Amino acid sequence: MSINVKVKIMTEKEKQQKGMLYQANDPEVLKDLYYCENECFEINQIPPSRREERMERLRKLFGKAGEGMFIVAPFFCDYGYNIEVGENFFANTNCVILDEAKVTFGDNVFIAPNCAFYTAGHPLDVEQRNKKIEYALPIHVGNNVWIGGNVVVVPGVTIGDNTTIGAGSVVTHDIPSGVVAAGNPCRVIRKLEE
């Protein structure tokens, strides 16, 4: 008796999307990365007098873009199609979204200058890291969130609805809804009144 088993070998891109370790310099992964790098460069060259053109290019680049989205140049992301923004999204200058995994922003999210959202992570094992092995975990930002200037959000973090993140924070773990949080690492300072 023989058993016929089919094993599907996952591509590096599929591993990336599932949060598994993947080869970051895989040709399929790099193709999308280089395409987006070029798109971001071109979008950032569009003058302020043609803002609507810039927003339209970003809407096409993103996986989802709600009404009222506005992003101040320069802006940078790795893939674009992993980014979903809700209604009335605003990101000030120098926003960086390394979207190796899904990054979702709810409605009425406001981001101050120089903020970074990193879904990409690297193994602590030096040999793996030196072989360009990475992993990616999603980031989720709820509705009605204000993120102060120079904030960094790391892989796998969720920020709840109606929350404010103070300037200069490094968000390394989930932050609940309805709070003010700040610091390095970011922690809840107080609950907001309902």
Regions found by a protein language model. Name each.
Residues 70, 79, 104, 140-142, ...:
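A generic "structured core" feature
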